[in-house]
UniProtKB/Swiss-Prot annotation:
One term under GO cellular component: periplasmic space
Residues of the signal peptide: 1-21
Protein's name according to its UniProt entry: Phospholipase C accessory protein PlcR
General function of this protein: May be involved in the regulation of synthesis of phospholipase C.
Length: 207
C-alpha cells in the first residue's frame, strides 16, 4: 500500500511541475501575427535562347555578302519556323532594295525579290499587290539615286565606246554568218568589259 501511495504522490508532483513550467513560459495573450506576405510571383523559367537560323536574326554568323545570304536562306528555309522565314525574307528584301539605291539593276533585283515575297505573303492576291508596291519603290529608288560618273568612270566609258566600235567592225569584216557574228561580238565585248571595268556586267553601263 505504501509503495502505491509513494508513486501516486510522485506522479502528482511531476504533473504540477510541468503545468507550472507551461504557465511560466507561455504568454497569457498570443503575440500579434504579421499578415502573410504576398508570395513572390513565380517567374516563368527562362527558355533557352535558340539562335535563329535566319541570317538577319543571327548577325554573328550571317555572311556579309548578300548573294551568300540569299543562298544560305534558300538552303535553310525548310528548317525555319514560319515566323523565322518571314523575318529573314523581309530582311533580305530590304537589303536588295538598298542595292538598287546604290546602282543595282532594278529588274534583276526585282526578280530576286519575287523569290522571297511568297515567304512574306502567302495569299496570292496580296502578294501580287506587295510585288507591285515593291517594284514601284525600286523604280523610284533607281531614278532618284542615279549619279553622274566620276572622271575615272568617264574615261572608262570613252575607252569602252572606242574599243567596242573596233571589235564590232572587225567581226563584221571577218564573219559572214549572222548568228556567228552575234555570238562573236557578244563574247568579245564581254572580254572587253572585263578588261576595262573588271567585270562582264558593270553597273556603270546600266545607269
Amino acid at each position: 500500500m505504501r509503495p502505491t501511495l509513494t508513486w501516486t504522490l510522485l506522479a502528482l508532483l511531476l504533473c504540477g511541475t510541468a503545468i507550472g513550467a507551461v504557465l511560466l513560459f507561455y504568454p497569457s495573450e498570443p503575440a500579434p501575427v504579421a499578415p502573410f506576405a504576398s508570395p513572390p510571383q513565380a517567374t516563368p523559367a527562362a527558355k533557352p535562347s535558340i539562335p535563329s537560323r535566319a541570317p538577319e536574326m543571327n548577325t554573328a554568323t550571317a555572311p556579309d555578302n548578300l548573294e551568300q545570304q540569299l543562298g544560305e536562306f534558300g538552303r535553310n528555309a525548310g528548317q525555319m519556323s514560319e515566323i523565322e522565314r518571314k523575318q529573314a525574307a523581309e530582311g533580305l528584301i530590304e537589303q536588295l532594295k538598298r542595292e538598287v539605291a546604290v546602282g543595282a539593276d532594278p529588274r534583276q533585283t526585282f526578280e530576286e525579290i519575287q523569290r522571297l515575297t511568297p515567304y512574306v505573303e502567302a495569299d496570292a492576291r496580296r502578294r501580287e499587290a506587295l510585288d507591285f508596291e515593291i517594284w514601284m519603290a525600286l523604280k523610284d529608288n533607281a531614278s532618284v539615286q542615279q549619279q553622274a560618273p566620276t572622271p575615272g568612270e568617264e574615261e572608262q566609258l570613252r575607252e569602252y565606246a572606242q574599243e567596242s566600235d573596233k571589235v564590232i567592225a572587225e567581226v563584221l569584216a571577218s564573219v559572214d554568218d549572222e548568228e556567228q557574228r552575234h555570238a562573236a561580238i557578244d563574247e568579245r565585248l564581254k572580254a572587253l568589259r572585263k578588261q576595262i571595268f573588271g567585270e562582264e556586267n558593270p553597273r556603270l553601263l546600266q545607269r
